[in-house]
Structures are given as structure tokens and as C-alpha cells.
């Protein structure tokens, strides 16, 4: 994920990507459908609408200075997961370091995980274990925003909540089949939600990259 910010015409670009998998299709992340953006002025989001396509998403938050009079810019990125064993999903971030505390910080970008749902009839429903969104990421930052003690907008979880490779989700197997290829209906979908509230930031340009990784997770019987 990359973020780029400019004074008065703040442009925030997030690029989501997936780390190369070493587990074949036994553990897999792909696009979960077309991402959406609301509340943006001159903003956009691009991604793959096909659930068998790679997860590569570019988000342009557009104008995020007070010239954007909307309360928040919200982006929802559906992410499809497939596994035939217990799994965990981790996210790592690089970039977005500003020495000036009045410039955009990682803590200014809300980030949460919501809306788990089956991806078709071959998605596995387990009765002995559930899919767990790790604290503090189980929230929609766009509806949980508040004004902090420092006068800046705060969220229950943000990009600053990521430290190294941070596990955000884990659970039991996701797929009924053992196909070596992605199918249209063989897993689960979760929504990664990003929120940025238009406000005053010191001028500058920033960038960051988010990498999503799926790997074998803790024991979770199905």
C-alpha cells in the first residue's frame, strides 16, 4: 500500500499486494471482488473484479484537505482467502514516516477488517472453530472515528497498529476442495476497510506499502 500526500490537494495512494506464496493453492489470497470508494473528491480505486485474479489494488483518496467537505473517505477492499488447513493472515507496512508530527502519520489512516462471508458453495463452514479478527482490527474505522485529545481524528485501529508482520486474522480451513487452482466459489471473503478524514495536514509527500501474507495458522479444528 502506498500513500502520497500533498498540501491542499492531498493525494493518498494505497497499493495492496500479496507476498509470493510458497504453499501453492493450499493457502491463497486473491481479489474478493471490485473495491469501492465513497466520500472522495477526485479520488478513485482500481482492482480486479474477478475473484480468481490477484489482489493488486490502488486507492487514490483524492482531496483530503478541508476542501473535501465530506466527513470521511472510505474504501472497502474485498479479499478472498482459500485454505485446506488452519490459516493466518498477516500484514506488514513500509514507508509513511514523517518527522513533522503535523504531517500525515500512519495513525491518521484507519484500518479494520469486517464482513466475513462465504465465497460460494465450496467455502467451508466449520462448527468447532470461528474466524477471528485479531484485536484491535475488528471494526469499521469509518463509523468508529472520534476526535482525539490532540484534536486529530482517531480510530480504534490504524496503519500505526501494524508493527512488523502483524497477524490480523486467523481461523480454520476455508475451502472444501483441494484444487491447485483458484475457483470462483471455494473460500471466504473479508473486507479490508480504510478510512481517512479530510483535515489540515502539513504539506509534504509520503508513501507506504502494505503486503498481505497468508500462512499456516494455529490449531483450529473444523
Indicate residue ranges for each PLM-predicted region.
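N-terminal small/polar-rich segments of proteins
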Residues: 23-137, 169-222
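Bacterial N-terminal signal peptides
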Residues: 8-18
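Positively charged n-region of N-terminal signal peptides that target proteins for export
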Residues: 1-5
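N-terminal regions of proteins, emphasizing targeting and processing segments when present
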Residues: 17-19, 113, 136-137, 147, ...
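Local beta-strand/beta-hairpin segments that build beta-sheet-rich folds
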Residues: 74, 142-182
Amino acid at each position: 500500500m502506498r500513500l502520497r500526500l500533498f498540501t491542499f490537494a492531498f493525494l493518498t495512494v494505497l497499493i495492496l499486494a500479496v507476498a509470493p506464496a510458497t504453499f501453492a493453492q493450499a493457502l491463497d489470497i486473491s481479489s474478493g471482488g471490485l473495491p469501492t470508494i465513497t466520500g472522495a473528491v477526485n479520488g478513485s480505486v482500481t482492482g480486479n473484479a474477478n475473484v480468481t485474479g490477484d489482489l493488486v489494488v490502488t486507492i487514490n483518496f483524492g482531496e483530503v484537505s478541508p476542501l473535501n467537505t465530506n466527513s470521511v473517505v472510505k474504501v472497502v477492499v474485498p479479499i478472498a482467502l482459500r485454505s485446506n488447513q488452519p490459516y493466518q493472515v498477516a500484514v506488514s507496512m513500509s514507508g509513511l514516516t514523517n518527522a513533522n508530527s503535523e504531517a500525515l502519520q500512519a495513525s491518521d489512516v484507519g484500518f479494520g477488517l469486517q464482513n466475513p462471508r462465504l465465497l460460494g458453495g465450496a467455502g467451508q463452514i466449520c462448527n468447532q472453530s470461528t474466524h477471528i479478527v485479531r484485536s484491535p482490527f475488528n471494526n469499521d474505522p469509518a463509523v468508529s472515528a472520534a476526535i482525539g485529545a490532540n484534536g486529530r481524528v482517531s480510530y480504534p485501529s490504524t496503519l500505526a497498529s501494524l508493527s512488523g508482520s502483524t497477524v490480523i486474522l486467523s481461523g480454520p480451513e476455508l475451502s472444501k476442495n483441494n484444487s491447485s487452482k483458484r475457483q470462483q466459489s471455494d473460500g471466504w471473503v473479508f473486507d479490508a476497510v480504510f478510512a481517512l478524514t479530510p483535515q489540515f495536514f502539513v504539506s509534504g509527500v509520503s508513501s507506504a506499502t502494505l503486503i498481505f501474507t497468508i500462512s499456516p495458522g494455529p490449531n483450529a479444528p473444523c
